[in-house]
């Protein structure tokens, strides 16, 4: 029997392992020089003005919303077709998530869908770049400017993505994820980027106990060990062990993303004619980084549902993923918003299936997945 093919696997090589060993030998393994280097390299690569490394994108969303003063009585517009962490953070802050539907084929929202949901209580919009493609940002930013509303881009899927002529993160405020399955990984980690210095400074303070400095700063700059708390904060800093991995991955990112694109081209060629429906590619100029490759499994066309297809692939030694079950269909939110209806989100949520895609895959692996799909569907 062939080896099991997972839907994702991190592309970790000798350079990443060597970088970790160097940090372990350095005597400084928590937040330190590698963090500062990563933040600077991220800015240099993508044209960001300010970057703050964090232990996760979820942590980044938490402290960013806090820094913007989001709290009870406020509304935050965001898609339900996303990972639940954003919705959880909004809810935990006492604010109200206002769910917006998405385009049925790109799974991204739009200014046209957002506009009717804006009220006097709307304080932020969180559009989601999806699966490696950029949301159509300019109309959303223009809408937000007219109403004086903050925009926080959920760029967890979009490291290395371009929208029109600019990198995601080059302007405005965006949050990236370095989770284990992401295009750039350090096991766990994230990055806030922004062109708002005051926001960056506040996030930097909130991410480390409200001190505004980390342990390395206090030692290297000769500050007193008893740095003062300016405001209550959290411990959301990234260790240098993780930052060292991220630095290597950042240097490799063009190569890793190019391999993903090559694999997707093979999928697109071989899946043509099958009753599966891949996500549509946006029509505006962009560079897609193919974080995920998803198809929709419509029982009326395929003769079986998504869960049955996933089980059949599992039995053939092929892993799949689900990105994502819509947040408002989860138990807590389903009970809190029993009358909420998002037709495009709900149709896709019950049909989405993520096929294997990672840089260490081969074209033969893609052919194996497609052969299994043909066998199952025919």
Swiss-Prot record:
GO terms for biological process: lipid A biosynthetic process; lipopolysaccharide biosynthetic process; response to antibiotic. Its EC number is 2.6.1.87. It catalyses: UDP-4-amino-4-deoxy-beta-L-arabinose + 2-oxoglutarate = UDP-beta-L-threo-pentopyranos-4-ulose + L-glutamate. SUPFAM superfamilies: PLP-dependent transferases. One of its GO terms (cellular component) is membrane. The modification N6-(pyridoxal phosphate)lysine is found at residue 182. One of its GO terms (molecular function) is UDP-4-amino-4-deoxy-L-arabinose aminotransferase. Its cofactor is pyridoxal 5'-phosphate. It is an enzyme of class 2 (transferase). Disulfide bonds: none annotated. Keywords: Aminotransferase, Antibiotic resistance, Lipid A biosynthesis, Lipid biosynthesis, Lipid metabolism, Lipopolysaccharide biosynthesis, Pyridoxal phosphate, Transferase. NCBIfam families: PRK11658.1. This is UDP-4-amino-4-deoxy-L-arabinose--oxoglutarate aminotransferase. The gene is arnB.
């Amino acid at each position: 029997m062939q080896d099991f093919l997972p839907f994702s696997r991190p592309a970790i090589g000798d350079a990443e392992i060597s970088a970790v060993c160097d940090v372990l030998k350095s005597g400084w393994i928590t937040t330190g020089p590698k963090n500062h280097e990563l933040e600077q390299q991220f800015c240099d690569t993508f044209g960001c003005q300010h970057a703050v490394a964090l232990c996760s994108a979820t942590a980044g969303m938490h402290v960013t919303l806090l820094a913007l003063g989001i709290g009870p009585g406020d509304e935050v517009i965001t898609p339900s077709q996303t990972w639940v962490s954003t919705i959880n953070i909004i809810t935990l802050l006492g604010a109200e998530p206002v769910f917006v539907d998405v385009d049925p084929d790109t799974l991204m929202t739009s200014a046209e869908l957002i506009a009717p949901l804006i009220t006097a209580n709307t304080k932020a919009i969180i559009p989601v770049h999806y699966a490696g493609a950029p949301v159509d940002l300019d109309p959303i930013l223009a809408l937000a400017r007219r109403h004086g509303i903050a925009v926080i881009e959920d760029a967890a899927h979009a490291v290395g993505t371009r929208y029109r002529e600019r990198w995601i993160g080059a302007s405005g405020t965006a949050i990236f994820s370095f989770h284990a399955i992401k295009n750039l990984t350090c096991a766990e980690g994230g990055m806030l980027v922004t062109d708002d210095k005051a926001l960056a400074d506040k996030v930097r303070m909130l991410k480390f106990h409200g001190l505004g400095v980390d342990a390395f700063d206090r030692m290297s700059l000769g500050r007193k060990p008893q740095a003062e708390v300016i405001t209550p904060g959290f411990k959301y800093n990234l260790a240098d062990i993780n930052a060292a991995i991220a630095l290597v991955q950042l240097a490799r990112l063009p190569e890793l993303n190019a391999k993903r694109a090559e694999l997707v081209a093979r999928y697109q060629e071989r899946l043509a004619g099958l009753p599966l429906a891949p996500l549509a590619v946006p029509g505006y100029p962009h560079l897609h980084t193919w974080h995920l490759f998803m198809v929709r499994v419509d029982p009326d066309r395929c003769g079986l549902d998504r869960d049955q297809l996933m089980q059949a692939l599992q039995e053939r030694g092929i892993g799949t993923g689900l990105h994502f079950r819509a947040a408002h269909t989860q138990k807590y939110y389903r009970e809190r918003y029993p009358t909420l209806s998002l037709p495009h989100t709900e149709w896709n949520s019950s049909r989405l299936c993520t096929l294997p895609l990672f840089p260490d895959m081969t074209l033969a692996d893609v052919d194996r997945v497609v052969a299994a799909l043909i066998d199952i569907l025919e």
